[in-house]
Amino acid sequence: MSLIPKKGTVYVVDDDEAVRDSLQWLLEGKGYRVRCFESAESFLSRYDAREVACLIVDIRMAAMTGLELQNRLIEARSPLPIVFITGHGDVPMAVDTMKKGAMDFIQKPFNEEQLVGLVERMLDHAKDTFADYQLSVSRDALLSKLTLRE
């Protein structure tokens, strides 16, 4: 029997410890596995693309911003659904993230019920796309082993 909740993993990346702690408390209380990171770099070093998950990320952080993290995930062809949270967002920034595939862009302080509903939708989306992603990775690995003649 697995100790990991059936609902999936929620990654939280925010440089504000209070935000990370409150999101972890809220989401673990709803049965989600939550993994928090204070920077995009620490998230990238420990992100496991083999699990059904979603990402809640602050748009503005010190070293690597949420937008830069989104771009890195796009380059890696990650299927990870993303929602951006911010205390200082603007319309062009929100539009940019959505055009690049973010599922939502919400302002702090956020409505807890809205956020939990959004996490549920993101994880449903992740479950739907996860099998396709794994198949794509397996196919690419097999194709890379072929010689030019094959």
PLM feature spans:
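Conserved acidic segment of CheY-like receiver
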Residues: I4-V19, L23-L27, A40, L55
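The feature encodes the CheY-like receiver
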Residues: R20, A62, T86, D90
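Short hydrophobic/Thr-rich beta-strand motif most characteristic of the beta2 strand and flanking loop
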Residues: G31-E38, S42, R46
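Acidic catalytic/metal-coordinating carboxylates
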Residues: E38-S39, M64-L69
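Active-site beta3 strand of CheY-like receiver
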Residues: R50-V57
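C-terminal output helix
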Residues: D90-P92, I106, F110-V119
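The C-terminal output helix
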Residues: E120-Q134
